[in-house]
Design a protein with these regions (language model features):
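Charge-rich, well-structured scaffold segments of protease-associated domains
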Residues: 28, 33-38, 90-241, 259, ...
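Positively charged n-region of N-terminal signal peptides that target proteins for export
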Residues: 1-4
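Peptidyl-prolyl cis-trans isomerase
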Residues: 44-47, 265
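Bacterial Sec-dependent signal peptides at the C-terminal "C-region" and cleavage site
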Residues: 15-26
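Short, low-order "capping/linker" segments at domain edges
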Residues: 253-261
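A structural supersecondary motif
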Residues: 270-274, 293-310
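Active/ligand-binding-proximal structured segments within catalytic/core domains
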Residues: 37, 46-95, 281-293, 301-303
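Bacterial N-terminal signal peptides
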Residues: 6-17
Length: 310
């Protein structure tokens, strides 16, 4: 799915800038927990007559096991392939017919779905998200072709990209015990062996209201939207709490190296270091340092290596 790097970078810069109103944003967010465990976050913003609906599930590649890696990302694709009441691609068509835009992404820690549309069409997105939280169709004739789409995505983005392949190996070398070592898109051999039943079991395990967060921001009345969320999601039963990832990565005791041999015009070298938590006091400092050192042609490393030492 399309990347949200620009939006993410904007959020990071906002959080890292002294004197910003990040704290006031937190004070303005309304937090609610429905009876079925669904967490709801609401932020009114009346600058424009639009709204964004996000549904986050606390499941990513870290929840997978060796032999079935890639399930989180495959399931992300299947969420757009119909429910018991909607046909394949009807979700996307409905959002676009209402003047909106939608997408999704999978990470190691979470899978998120979002739609941006006019605020007076907000209820459309809420109903669609509630439907696919509980009624995903999982038709075999949709699963098999979509799995092939994911495999082709892996070929294009990783297998055929030397730099991407190197970073995949770096991740595998950095983690020896924790499932963070899996690539989010999964290992190709695992993808070849995944079945519809694997994905269905994974969906039933993790796509539960008690394992999800609904986030709405934009031009709306929070009290009214909360009522709509209760109407759409409140009756979805919570089946059970999914298992917790308990793996702990042991301390690294020495340098680790990995080498990837691929046809390429130029050699590529990457160095990775263990860093403190991103939400800790040093997280923003490291983000800014990385930008100063290596972000773009004006960065210090680029000027030094390309212009001064060429």
């Amino acid at each position: 799915m399309r990347s949200g790097i620009a939006s993410l970078l904007g959020a990071v810069l906002l959080a890292c800038t002294p004197g910003t109103s990040a704290a006031s944003y937190g004070e303005r967010v309304g937090e609610h927990i429905l009876d079925n465990g669904l967490k709801v976050l609401l932020l009114e913003d009346r600058k424009a007559p639009v709204a964004v609906v996000q549904v986050w599930y606390r499941v990513g590649s870290r929840n997978e096991v060796l032999g079935k890696t890639g399930l989180s990302h495959v399931l992300e694709h299947m969420m757009f392939k119909g429910t018991e009441t909607l046909g394949p691609d009807d979700y996307s068509r409905t959002i676009k017919r209402n003047g909106g835009d939608e997408n999704a992404f999978t990470t190691a820690d979470a899978t998120a779905y979002y739609a941006k549309l006019a605020s007076d069409r907000l209820s459309v997105a809420l109903r669609l998200e509630a439907d696919r939280m509980q009624n995903l169709a999982f038709a075999e004739e949709q699963f098999t072709p979509e799995l092939k789409v994911v495999m082709e995505e892996r070929r294009l983005r990783t297998a055929d990209q030397p730099i991407a392949a190197l970073f995949e190996q770096i991740r595998s070398a950095a983690y020896t015990a924790h499932p963070y070592q899996w690539p989010v898109i999964g290992w190709m051999n695992d993808l070849r062996q995944l079945t519809r039943e694997d994905a269905l079991d994974y969906y039933r395990m993790y796509y539960d209201p008690a394992n999800a967060i609904v986030v709405v921001t934009g031009d709306f009345d929070a009290a009214l939207v909360l009522d709509e969320i209760r109407d759409s999601f409140g009756a979805i039963p919570s089946r059970r709490r999914p298992p917790i990832v308990r793996a702990i990565e042991p301390p690294q005791r020495g340098e680790r190296r990995t080498k990837v041999a691929r046809p390429a015009a130029l050699p590529f070298v990457a160095m990775a270091f263990h860093a403190p938590p991103a939400n800790g006091p040093d997280g923003c400092v490291l983000d800014v340092s990385a930008d100063v050192l290596s972000d773009g042609k004006s960065s210090r490393l680029h000027r030094d290596l390309v212009y001064e030492r060429r």
